[in-house]
């Protein structure tokens, strides 16, 4: 059995759900213990290069689907990281209470090259425009009133059609 099986993000035989995040259709994207594993690896790397901080980009929209995106998890991990070694590593988590639209607005203010960022769970050459992360990305840009420079697949639904039935942020 593959390591971390049972998720559409780690198992090729499980299809990535399309549509907006709902508890049922997005359960397939939960990777067991993903953020604890990644934060542990990041902590080890930070210690090896003598960095004083690691950053964790969970945001408020993730909390309902992913238990390891809740503020309580981040607090517990911050404490564990401080206890993990004699060197102190701070876990910074600036977006834990922000929406994706808040993050897009701030990114636009800072000149983030959004065209070079990736959200799609399907992993093609272009963003699919149909999975939960693509829909939330489009919604965030729309709500933030920032032009989305992301190239989406030709068959992706229009922003107008998504706005009419799917927006939830």
What is each residue range found by the language model?
Residues 1-111:
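ATP-dependent adenylation/nucleotidyltransferase module used to activate substrates
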Residues 19-24, 78-82, 116-119, 143-146, ...:
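Glycine-rich loops and low-complexity Gly/Arg-rich segments
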Residues 27-28, 84-89, 125, 149-151, ...:
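Short C-terminal domain-edge/linker segments immediately following a structured domain
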Residues 40, 118-139:
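Local cysteine-cluster metal-coordination motifs and their immediate loop/turn environment
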Residues 49, 115, 129:
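Structured loop/turn residues at beta-strand edges in well-structured enzyme cores
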Residues 54, 121-127, 146-154:
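Charge-dense, low-complexity polyampholytic segments
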Residues 95-121, 159-167:
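Short, charged low-complexity linear segments at domain edges
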Residues 135-137, 141-169:
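Short Fe-S-cluster ligation motifs
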